[in-house]
């Protein structure tokens, strides 16, 4: 019996399936069915985009936005609860910025033309932030506040010039997740801010530091200049830090490297407009953050998905990154591993997007200049993905290195280079792969590890398992021996009892005299 129990114990500790070492995403309750469920492909794509932009200043991080009033509340076609549920669903689908119209009414701040208080809105906002506050799902969120001054009777109790907005934010959301003007001043004073050209005393922190070091999630900007900012220390004066176009874009389409660089020096480029599926992607490609003002009712809210599907992933194709499993028979005849990314250039419309490609396919690679993110060339020769490993002979020209575009403007620089060199449709290797762990897309070559899951090679796994297996076998042999061959003391139990009885007769009770 002891042997059977030990065998069971060894099986449980050694052979049982190992759980994933990554942090599991919290399930966020889905109460609406207007938009399709967020697929794993979209989740992997959003996560890979965020991770590759870890060193990008936050003012250059691309994001899609929605105007809450125009999309849900205008003309009163949606009830308040439905609008809040749609707001939650948009955040779950990757929308990162929202325009919020506020007006003072009944001694409190209310969302324009609705019965939704700003406090109630922030409670829904906080629910999403708390539910996504882990290294798999954390992202930056921006609220663009439009303040209606209101009349004196309506504004009584809301605080002069918005002074009680700070109290509302403290009570409903909390200071710890908000990046404030004081935080920015501190970072600039101590040299922790950057622009696209490097360290900059008037720049912004990089995304990785913002999310993981400072543990911030939210930036609030007021774009109507109705607040006294000494009374609202959590809110940025939007007119001094962002470029907001409404209706029509005022920034031209850059056609040279210098023009792209100049465009990248403009912080927080937003365009509020009614978009179509044909134009919204074009604005993303030239560095704008579209804020959708299209009007939707309960019956047609799902139409917004067409716009999101084209823009949430500025890098990958809408149906990528796919998980492609090759059959055993195919592996026997050729080397196959669909764990590498390639930039697919289409010459017909001078566009580019990323595809999952077989790592052993032969392509050229994209090389970035060491001192300028907007100067790119094609590698000298063709090779499989592993041929572009940093340990291999460099296939990039001097002062260039194998890389990938980290923003839409960098990708625009690539497409213009390919256009000027009359490149045909082609695939080019970029520094993105999931070689370590399937569906965990990382940069840094094939040796890069997945930060969310521990990868164990077969050789290392055998090395780890062998000592445990040998020890378990020895223990089993000992247990088997003890069960089969009895110890002599058990065979002579009666003799031992007689000896003990005789010895006990010589023991003296009490204290000797």
UniProtKB/Swiss-Prot annotation:
Parts of the chain that traverse the membrane: 461-481
Membrane topology label: Single-pass type I membrane protein
Record's subcellular location: Membrane
Residues modified by glycosylation: 79, 115, 130, 135, 151, 154, 161, 164, 237, 248, 262, 309, 349, 420
Membrane-side (Cytoplasmic) residue stretches: 482-513
GO cellular component: membrane
Alphabetized InterPro entries for the sequence: Telomere_Capping_Maintenance
Keywords: Glycoprotein, Membrane, Signal, Transmembrane, Transmembrane helix
Pfam family, one: TIM-barrel_MTC6
Domain of life: Eukaryota
Family stated for the protein in its record: Belongs to the MTC6 family.
Role of this protein: May be involved in telomere capping.
Name of the molecule in the record: Maintenance of telomere capping protein 6
Organism (species): Zygosaccharomyces rouxii (strain ATCC 2623 / CBS 732 / NBRC 1130 / NCYC 568 / NRRL Y-229)
Annotated gene: MTC6
């Amino acid at each position: 019996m002891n042997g059977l129990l030990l065998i069971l114990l060894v099986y449980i500790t050694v052979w049982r399936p190992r759980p994933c070492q990554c942090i599991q995403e919290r399930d966020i309750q889905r109460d609406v069915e207007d938009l399709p469920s967020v697929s794993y492909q979209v989740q992997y794509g959003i996560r890979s985009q965020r991770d590759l932009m870890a060193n990008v200043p936050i003012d250059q991080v691309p994001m899609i936005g929605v105007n809450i009033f125009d999309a849900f509340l205008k003309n009163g076609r949606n009830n308040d609860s439905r609008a809040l549920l749609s707001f939650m669903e948009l955040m779950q689908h990757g929308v990162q910025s929202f325009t919020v119209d506020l007006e003072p009414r009944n001694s409190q701040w209310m969302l324009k033309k609705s019965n939704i208080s700003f406090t109630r809105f922030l409670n829904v906002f906080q629910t999403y932030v708390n539910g996504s506050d882990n290294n798999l799902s954390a992202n930056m969120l921006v609220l663009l506040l439009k303040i209606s001054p209101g009349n004196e009777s309506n504004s009584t109790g809301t605080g002069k010039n918005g002074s009680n907005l700070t109290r509302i934010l403290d009570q409903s959301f909390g200071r710890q997740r908000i990046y404030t003007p004081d935080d920015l001043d501190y970072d600039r004073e101590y040299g922790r801010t950057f622009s696209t050209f490097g360290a900059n005393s008037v720049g912004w922190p990089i995304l990785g530091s913002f999310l993981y070091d400072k543990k911030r999630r939210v930036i609030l900007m007021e774009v109507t200049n109705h607040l006294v900012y000494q009374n609202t220390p959590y809110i940025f004066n939007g007119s001094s830090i962002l470029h907001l176009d409404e209706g029509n874009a005022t920034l031209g389409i850059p056609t040279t490297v210098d023009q792209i660089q100049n465009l990248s020096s403009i912080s927080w480029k937003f365009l509020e407009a009614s978009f179509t599926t044909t134009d919204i992607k074009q604005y993303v490609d030239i560095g704008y953050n579209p804020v959708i003002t299209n009007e939707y009712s309960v019956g047609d809210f799902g139409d917004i998905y067409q716009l999101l599907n084209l823009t949430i992933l500025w890098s990958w194709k809408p149906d990528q990154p796919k998980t492609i499993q090759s059959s055993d028979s195919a592996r026997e005849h050729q080397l196959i591993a669909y764990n590498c990314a390639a930039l697919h250039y289409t010459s017909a419309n001078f566009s580019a997007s990323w595809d999952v490609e077989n790592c052993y396919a032969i392509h050229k690679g994209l090389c970035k200049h060491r001192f300028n993110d907007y100067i790119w060339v094609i590698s000298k020769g063709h090779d499989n993905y592993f041929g572009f490993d940093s340990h291999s002979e460099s296939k990039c020209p001097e002062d260039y290195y194998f890389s990938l575009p980290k923003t839409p403007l960098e990708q625009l620089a690539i497409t213009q280079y390919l256009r000027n060199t009359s490149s045909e449709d082609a695939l080019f290797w970029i520094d993105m792969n999931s070689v370590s762990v399937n569906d965990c897309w990382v940069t840094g070559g094939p040796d890069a590890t997945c930060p969310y899951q521990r990868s164990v090679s077969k050789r290392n796994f055998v090395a780890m398992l062998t000592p445990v297996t040998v020890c378990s076998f020895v223990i089993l042999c000992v247990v088997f021996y003890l069960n089969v061959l009895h110890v002599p003391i058990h065979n002579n139990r009666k003799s031992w009892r007689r000896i003990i009885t005789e010895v006990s007769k010589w023991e003296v009770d009490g204290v000797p005299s």
